[in-house]
Amino acid sequence: MQRTELASLYKATPADGTKVTVCGWAKTVRDSKNIGFISLSDGSCYKPVQIVFQADKLANYAEIAKCGLYTSFEVTGTLVLTPNAKQPFEINADTITVLGPCGPEYPLQKKKMSMDYLRTMTHLRPRTNTFNAAFRVRGQAAFALHQFFHEHGFTYVHTPIFTGSDCEGAGEMFQVTTLDLNDIPRNEEGGVD
């Protein structure tokens, strides 16, 4: 069965009872004796989907129940509409495959993390709710701005970036001045004007 992105499920929810396959990582994993819940996200949209898994349907129930946050899964199951719940639908799992376990040493945890702490792991920040939302807003704002100017006949040009850093001799390629560097005009105090 072909993988379905969560964003497409939220845009056009299939009929109740439709079989779907989704992949993603666990935002939360909760379980009791016979039933468990995974909040699964795939990065295609902000909202996760709730996966319901039951001990009598899955041989690997105990393995799944022990999985930590950010473990990646492939889930095949039945989409069930839930109009009276917080989410519009959930997926009752028929099979769950653990694609990649995630141990307790993984730096992102369910507890609140400070911005200073997240700054040390820039490659993982998009997985947090705060940065995920901020990047989506920035992406939509940039798209709207580019679309507006494009529709009004403007051309987007990638201009060179001038910086004060001279890394590995890159600044020797060209100079950004019209002055003769061998004979720079100086003011009365001897400084460059």
Q: Can you annotate each of these PLM segments?
A:
Residues M1-D193:
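Class II aminoacyl-tRNA synthetase catalytic cores and aaRS-like
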